[in-house]
Amino acid sequence: MSGLAKLLINVAAVILLTVSVQADTLANCTYEDIRGTWVFELGPSHKEGSKDWECTSTTQISVQYKVKITLDYPDIAIDEFGNKGFWTLIYNQGFEVVVGGSKYFGFSVFKDKTVSICSKANPGWAHDVLGHDRRCFQGQKQSPAVKFMKKTGRDSSLRFEPSINSEEMVASINKAQKSWTATTYPQFQGLTHDDFVRMAGGKRSRMLSRPRSVPITEKQDSVRGTLPSSFDWRKVNGQNYVSPVRNQAACGSCYAFASMAMAESRLQILTNNTQKHVFAPQDIVECSPYSQGCDGGFPYLIGGKYAEDFGLVEEKCNPYKGHDGKCSTESSCARNYVTDYKYIGGYYGACNEVAMMEAIYNRGPVAVGFMVYGDFMSYKSGVYHHVFENHPFEPFELTNHAVLVVGWGEVTSPSPDRYWIVKNSWGTGWGMDGYFWIRRGSDECGIESMAVEATPIFRFN
């Protein structure tokens, strides 16, 4: 047994003796749990521009309208009037439907910290496709029936420092393979278990299951042949279209940083580098109803839906603090919007390597989520892949860490390998000046399974 495996077993024993209560988590619902016929109940319209469009699990809806909608395979939505639209699962926690000129988004219901009720949607947000006629709605699935599902989590008060960032773990990683190099980081010393979890996505970004990247089609295989073997938006005709690396610190706001970075880069591309914005992740952490602050969130809902519904503000309007708080963004701050947000491939579960390459090359960097293992924290350089896949226990909670893919490349030494070029949000003192390479073409850690893109709307300043 390797030194790292022994170390992980020892860590497991400590954790198993320590953890005794469950953490508060969000729902854990699958595609088949959501697919079927639903009835959406809509409340009264909110005055446009008002700040009272708050739809939460405690919202009491005075039902004014009901609409029946069938959600079918793979992403088809049909309302009771015969209008045809589309829908997508949003990770394992909710869904969005666009049909009949209206949009509906809601989180699935969860109760008692462990039970997901996937046949119900918490009071969520409904509006027409232009962002007007804003209402709260709630959903009830009619058929087929869905059973309760249970899941577990860690105690959110746990204060245990795992042996991540230890010399022993780093030595074991470097001995086991030659594709990438691990190192220890002084800035990680003294961080708690909760700190590491937030850095890697936050407790509310945990996913008990994730989609696999779909097989590459014959048409996509021909598209691959038209794309360059390497590409990097930092180096296009002597221009850099990617904003600087930032540091999220010990706040689970990676989803906000990845979303802001995608909007920043795509706006630079759209304006031929004449507009270089730095958008405010703190506005997301404090103000977004579609995420959970420093406990996590997802780029589809922030770089996409929030940016379209509410807009993004400049960093100077709400400078980054790295912790939760009351929304302090001034209403006078200018808003920058996006449109046409979607999962790469069209819906959740339709992504793959070639679809990502095509989107990146033709439209700009994409925000992705991938599963973070403990060894990733020690990455220094090279083509990352998870080490010791079959060890008996992984002491680090698997979270969905959001980052920005800006390009791709290939290496021939020490062995041939293909990789993605990825911008992280842990500062320039981590990895390769804040970037990392990760194996491409094999859905390493799920990085090719749920990429997101959105198109910024150009503003004349």
Residue map of PLM features:
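Tryptophan-anchored aromatic micro-motifs
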Residues: A23-Q60, G85, K120-H132
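Generic short beta-strand segments
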Residues: F40-K47, G100-S102, M371-Y373
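Contiguous, well-ordered beta-strand patches that form the walls/edges
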Residues: L71-S116
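Edge beta-strand at a domain terminus
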Residues: D24-L26, A126-R154, V405
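Catalytic-core signature of thiol
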Residues: K147-N461
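Cleavable N-terminal signal peptides of Sec/SRP-targeted secreted and luminal proteins
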Residues: G3-A23
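Extracellular beta-rich ligand/substrate-recognition surface
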Residues: T58-I61, D79-E80, Y343-A350
